[in-house]
């Protein structure tokens, strides 16, 4: 089992050495201008840039959500006296119960279309 562990360790070290050697040679294959630019970028700290972007995106999202909520609230208040909304708000179960209690007052009307008496319904 120790030989397997040694083999694994040896392979890992070999792959790591090849990869690091390749990356170092690839990185050295740059011009002086690219190296100067890379040194300047490495010297700068981008943590504050990321923080700034997060704050700006957060403020923008807060403003958008506030506008959305205020618009929805104003539309809800604007249409509160609309007959459609009053229709929904009313308690229809109570109306049905009151109609059932007064069955003696109910009336039925039958309407007949005399012009359509010659037509038959096809199966």
Swiss-Prot record:
Belongs to the potassium channel KCNE family. The lineage of its organism: Eukaryota, Metazoa, Chordata, Craniata, Vertebrata. Interacts with KCNB1. Associates with KCNH2/ERG1. May associate with KCNQ2 and KCNQ3. Associates with HCN1 and probably HCN2. Heteromultimer with KCNC2. Interacts with KCNC2. Interacts with KCNQ1; forms a heterooligomer complex that targets to the membrane raft and leading to currents with an apparently instantaneous activation, a rapid deactivation process and a linear current-voltage relationship and decreases the amplitude of the outward current. Residues 70-123 are cytoplasmic. One of its GO terms (biological process) is establishment of localization in cell. This is Potassium voltage-gated channel subfamily E member 2. InterPro entries: K_chnl_KCNE, K_chnl_volt-dep_bsu_KCNE2. It holds the Pfam family ISK_Channel. One of its GO terms (cellular component) is membrane. It comes from the Eukaryota. It is a single-pass type I membrane protein; Single-pass membrane protein. The keyword ATP-binding does not apply. GO terms for molecular function: identical protein binding; monoatomic cation channel activity; potassium channel regulator activity; transmembrane transporter binding; voltage-gated potassium channel activity; voltage-gated potassium channel activity involved in ventricular cardiac muscle cell action potential repolarization.
């Amino acid at each position: 089992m120790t030989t397997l562990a040694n083999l694994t360790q040896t392979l890992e070290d070999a792959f790591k050495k090849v990869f690091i050697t390749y990356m170092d040679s690839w990185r050295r294959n740059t011009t002086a201008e690219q190296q100067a630019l890379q040194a300047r970028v490495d010297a700068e700290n981008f943590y504050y840039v990321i923080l700034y972007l997060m704050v700006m995106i957060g403020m923008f999202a807060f403003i958008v959500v506030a506008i959305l909520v205020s618009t929805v609230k104003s539309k809800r208040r604007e249409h509160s006296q609309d007959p459609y909304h009053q229709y929904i708000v009313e308690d229809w179960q109570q109306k049905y119960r009151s109609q059932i209690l007064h069955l003696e007052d109910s009336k039925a009307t039958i309407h007949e279309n005399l012009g359509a008496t010659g037509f038959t319904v096809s199966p």
